[in-house]
Amino acid sequence: MEVREELKEIIERARAAAEAAGELPHGEYAPVQRLEIPKAKEFGDYSTNAAMQWARTAHKAPRAIAESIVKYIDAPLVSKMEIAGAGFINFFLAADTVYAELRNILSAGASYGDLPKDKKDKILVEYVSANPTGPLHIGHARGAAYGSALVNLLRAAGYDVYAEYYVNDAGSQIAHLAESVNARYLQLLGKDVDVPDDGYHGYDIVETAKSLIDREGDAYLSMDEEARLKVFKTVALSEKLSILKKDLADFHVTFDNWFSEKSLYPKQVDDALDTLKKDGYLYEKDGAWWLATTKNGDDKDRVVIRANGEPTYFCSDIAYVPNKEKRGYNKLIDIWGADHHGYIIRIHSAMKFLGYNPEDFEIMLLQMVTLLRDGQPVKMSKRTGQAVTLRELMDEVGSDAARYFFCSRTLDSQMDFDIDLAKKQSSDNPVYYIQYANARIHSLFAQAKEAGVKWGNWEKTDFTKLTEECELDLVKKMENYHMLIDGAAKERAPQRVAKYAYELAGLFHHFYRECRILGVEEGVTQARLGLITAVQHVLVHALSILGVSAPERM
């Protein structure tokens, strides 16, 4: 049993003993709700406000309740307890508890941090889902890093998770893509044509047209335009998706499924719309079909089918949510750009009308990213004169730095991305600082091996040799990693893992400066090698959640 859960049981047993002794009245006491790690070491290793929680039931002052609880706690798990303020109980772990936790970490090895796969929820996380009409930009990059880290975090926390990319391949944007590629293709072959005003004017479209010419030359010129556009629609979409998948793979982002919007047509879309019509939520006006979202607080009803018969984006989304639910997912998480905020009430309305619970659909909004170079905003790419792409960012700062920086901030806050800091090979750069801790550990392993030291028999290692404060602080930090994973997953907050990894690396660097591993008593060497082995396991686990590599040399 984890220390935190064991402490909760100890507290509740002490309360029951106080009840039995008549010091607390009998009543319906709720389980301990909060047992947290204090921000300052002087307040112990764990702290609870249980006495305050039970004050109303006991009809006593929280401090008096705390005194009764402490009186009936006799547990070797803790070395001492203190009552603070109005009734907080602070617990200081016994040294034997700390040593036992170190053994637990070493026993679990690389899987330490993985929680039991006993969660009932089956979760589908959909993220990025950018239109496949051009390269991914830094806004997409932020969503990609955060989304994949969230998937990794939920899996580590024991959830059944499925990652999906929704490919928008059914709308007018694909027709505009084909028209734009067609225009560039003809231009490159000497024809005087313009890219349509509603087309795509990016440099990448020229690249796609060039690749067509490189492969097929002018073979498509002999086709009539309708046939050529049909081919270009397929070829351009395939090429754009291929580039997009390559960029994401190089960014350590993978999906379990690439879901085609076209697959929803016609049956699943028709079924959803028929249900809405039958129940009176979808109505016809001015030749178009409207969903009555004002019934759920929207400022106006929304068009689903235009008067010309063309479906809106909203139309396929109405069918996509039931599709997810019917595949067995009872929790849906989407990551959208902040500009989609007004879309939330629409999709939640459609869910409610179709008989689904909107509370099962979590929508996380990501705010914009500002790239900074020399302290100044970077507006455009020097190469293309357009928005900076994910590929360009990876080429300049690397995947690891980009992912860590994106994962270290909450999605709902605007972010300044300091390119100069991300490129630094020093402790000023947080990802370098963390990776360097891992590299240092491997360097220590190499030195120990070269010195002929054998280690790894943890059952026979005497960890009571670890008496320095910096050593015990490391173990205590690692002991609460499980709690961190559980809490961060529930909060959908991979940034907490990023912060934890940085703090653990800091504790290790302090230990490295203060404690020698070689050239000391053999038992101390063995114990410290066990300690840094545990640190290495936890650091690598945390970095893997963030999608950041753990190089052995730097």
Kindly give the residue locations of the regions a language model identified.
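Non-catalytic interaction-recognition regions
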Residues: 1-99, 110-554
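Short, charged, solvent-exposed linker or helix-capping segments at domain edges/interfaces
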Residues: 100-105
